[in-house]
Amino acid sequence: MKLSFTKNKDVDSEDIANKVQTFENIVGSSLVQKLIKAATVKCKKCGKNRLEVAIDYYLGKMSDICLKCRLLVPVIKTVVGNSISIFGMSEKELIDLMQDSYWTKGLVSVIKGLGETGIEKPFVPAAPLQVQWDLTDSELSFKQIHDEIDKLADFGVAHITFIGEVDSTFIKHADDVGMYPCLTGNGFNLEKIDKYVDAGVKFVDISLESVNPKTHNEKLGIDNLWENAVESIKKYNEKDVYVEVSTEVTQDNLLEIPQIIELLKQLGVGWYKLDVVNGDLTDNQRLELFKLIYMENINGDMQILTNDPQLGDVASTIMCNGMNMIPTHFF
């Protein structure tokens, strides 16, 4: 499934701002927050906490629920309906998307977070939306790893990212308990990719530090790593696994970023994540980079993310000048 947001050059920025303000007023009201907080208790009749039951009913996943849980459904419809209208998404599109359990986990965590802390910048969900796990050899048994995956799923974590190559059974178990299994690394053993796909991996993040193979390989200290990364991207795309590519932005490769963007577009990459090294770029270089990210998100086919919350400030400033709103990583 390709993840995207609506790019509509005819969107009225003032209308969006009004919708955002309406959403903040609704969610920020003491009544809505009290109702959401009260809904986090487990319903003995329905078998889950009331918020999850009401959301599942709204999404059409449950039909027979008790009266107390049913009373929450209008609150859910109001909160969700106002939020999706900001990005031009229909209720049917949302309901279709949320049939996958990991999307529902994320929605539950977001609504719980709204009840606990309201709208904060950066926003704090009730549970981490994603957990990254670097499994070290022989630290834990298979059973212990499976048990920890179960705990994360029960806590409400929607995505789990395994760092490096792991046993495919862990990917399968994460998929079985309703999480979104991901892998991240510099490249992958091409012979293992089919196993990972069969186990249920949904998303991979692959590092690419340069358009020049020699520069990339020397930076990471491994021969043929650039070639492996590109082949991994191609093979995962063939298997319909969502591909994100990451680059650590420094003075050494800043001028290459536009070229890397063009290469990744040719390879059919869905997301491009730029990790900006603290203190390495000048303020003006960072500003120009964030402007590039903004314009690529508005005009390009590939979405670009960053670990730097300053993109939110840049996007807000540009939007005030009549341009479109984009989702940013922390803002």
Question: Across the structure, where does each feature detected by a protein language model lie?
Answer:
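Short N-terminal helix-initiation segments at or just after the protein's N-terminus
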Residues: 70-79, 181, 279-288
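N-terminal pre-triad scaffold of radical SAM enzymes
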Residues: 116-144, 150, 158-163
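Radical SAM/AdoMet-radical enzyme domain recognition
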Residues: 142-163, 167-282
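Charged/polar, solvent-exposed surface patches and flexible loops
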Residues: 34-41, 53, 57, 147, ...
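Short, intrinsically disordered, charge-balanced linker/junction segments flanking boundaries
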Residues: 131-137, 272-275, 323-331
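Flexible, acidic/Gly-rich N-terminal and inter-domain linker regions that tether
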Residues: 1-127
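A C-terminal junction/extension of Radical SAM enzymes
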Residues: 280-331
